[in-house]
Amino acid sequence: MDERRTVKVSKYLSKHLRHQPERIGLTLDENGWVAVEELLRAAARHGFAFSRAELDHVVAANDKRRFTVENGCAADGVHGDRIRANQGHTVAVDLDLPPAEPPAHLYHGTVARVMDAIRTEGLRPMARHHVHLSPDRETATRVGARRGRPLVLTVDAGAMHRAGHVFRVSANGVWLADAVPPRFLLLRG
């Protein structure tokens, strides 16, 4: 599978497993899962056919591990394999992730033009359900670079956790929080 096709299928999956499942007639369960066969049929009906082999390649090759496939599932009316996006949903789903103790520091990639709002309001999920935090500066830099020249913010996750804030970690290692109040951002200057 060539790189262009891989990216195209990955973007299609993100759009329909995170943001707009209804556009192709999918109904995600409460935890964001849908039967693989249902997804493949819906995509084909809406003019974007791809094979199970292509789907498996995208799931395995995605450097950000955006998707999870569970094989042989027999839960919630799904019999067979099911798939979901690991995080980043704008549709209502409960990823059913247990609370987790974060490392002392986590990182958030952003850009300068939103720093005034961040200093005042902290980090908010915006259209998503959670604020996404990276376990290392390198990942946060790549995230911030998608919107321009990146700035990396350090989050005092240990202090946040001790203050009662709940963290969860998705299947691909992205840390999730409901919000990050400004007092837990370690800002210079």
From Swiss-Prot:
Signal peptide: none annotated. Its EC number is 2.7.1.-. Transmembrane segments: none annotated. GO terms for molecular function: NAD+ poly-ADP-ribosyltransferase activity; tRNA 2'-phosphotransferase activity. Keywords: NAD, Transferase. Gene3D superfamilies: 3.20.170.30, RNA 2'-phosphotransferase, Tpt1/KptA family, N-terminal domain. It is an enzyme of class 2 (transferase). GO terms for biological process: tRNA splicing, via endonucleolytic cleavage and ligation. NCBIfam families: PRK00819.1-4 (NF002014). Belongs to the KptA/TPT1 family. Removes the 2'-phosphate from RNA via an intermediate in which the phosphate is ADP-ribosylated by NAD followed by a presumed transesterification to release the RNA and generate ADP-ribose 1''-2''-cyclic phosphate (APPR>P). May function as an ADP-ribosylase. This is Probable RNA 2'-phosphotransferase. It comes from Streptomyces griseus subsp. griseus (strain JCM 4626 / CBS 651.72 / NBRC 13350 / KCC S-0626 / ISP 5235).
